[in-house]
Amino acid sequence: MKPTPRRIEQLGGGWVAEEALAIGLWCALSADSLEEGVIRAVNHSGDSDSTGLIAGHFLGLLHGPEAVPARWVDNLELHDVIERIALDISLVPGGYRSDGSEASRAIWERYPGW
């Protein structure tokens, strides 16, 4: 069964965590593409930015960054900065150690705020 605005409303508005997670996950798992899932997740009258974010995260994990439509990214302000931060975040679990390693030094050079 595909999510529709009416069916989504039966789960709630997404204003609390369990509703937002249910809506985002349902939209992600029932979609044939990242675009379809995110659009479904935001086309309801509830907390659509949160449900869209959740669906987008799951769909990005499943399909990778190349699944994001180019027209969503092409004119995105600070695209290069966002992409660099995303890459750095992806390195943290495996490559970052606070032991002075090369990855650690590179992170501290880019984000020296501490």
Region spans (language model):
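Small-residue-rich helix-loop
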Residues: 1-11
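Structural motif
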Residues: 11-18
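Catalytic phosphate/nucleotide-handling subdomain of diverse soluble enzymes
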Residues: 19, 23-108
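Juxtamembrane cytosolic face of transmembrane helices
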Residues: 109-114
